Amino acid sequence: MRYYEIVFMVHPDLSEQISSIINRYTTIVTNAQGKVHRIENWGRRQLAYPVNKLCKAYYVLLNIEVSQDTVKELNDDFHFNKNIIRSMIVRTKYAIVEPSPMMKKIEENQEHHATNI
């Protein structure tokens, strides 16, 4: 089993289905005897440039431990799923479980807004 970091962008009109999409991919990992070490939903964010005529997308980060066959299955699913705008799979040397810099920034913004109310 190897460690991977996956970032994928979901169509912005699917706000109610984000959790089911995340659940779908985590289920694929766990059914293949893999482990999910980290799940982060970064929310709806502005894209740096239009992708498929869209200017916003929901970003999701997964850190997983799976076999190469499962990664190929996930990659194929990302490519054939019309709701996934873009995806990137990167192999890592170890399991990453701490919050990403993006998630830390989101949490700081939420705390800042909570204290200003």
From Swiss-Prot:
GO cellular component, one term: cytosolic small ribosomal subunit
UniProt key word RNA-binding: yes
CDD domains: bS6 (cd00473)
Protein keywords: Ribonucleoprotein, Ribosomal protein, RNA-binding, rRNA-binding
Family matches, as InterPro entries: Ribosomal_bS6, Ribosomal_bS6_sf, Ribosomal_S6_plastid/chlpt, Transl_elong_EF1B/ribsomal_bS6
A single GO molecular function term of this UniProt record: small ribosomal subunit rRNA binding
Domain of life: Bacteria
Biological process terms in GO annotation: translation
SUPFAM superfamilies hit by this protein: Ribosomal protein S6
Function (record text): Binds together with bS18 to 16S ribosomal RNA.
PANTHER family: MITOCHONDRIAL 28S RIBOSOMAL PROTEIN S6, SMALL RIBOSOMAL SUBUNIT PROTEIN BS6M
Family listed: Belongs to the bacterial ribosomal protein bS6 family.
Record protein name field: Small ribosomal subunit protein bS6
Lineage, opening ranks: Bacteria, Pseudomonadati, Pseudomonadota, Gammaproteobacteria, Enterobacterales
Gene name for this UniProt entry: rpsF
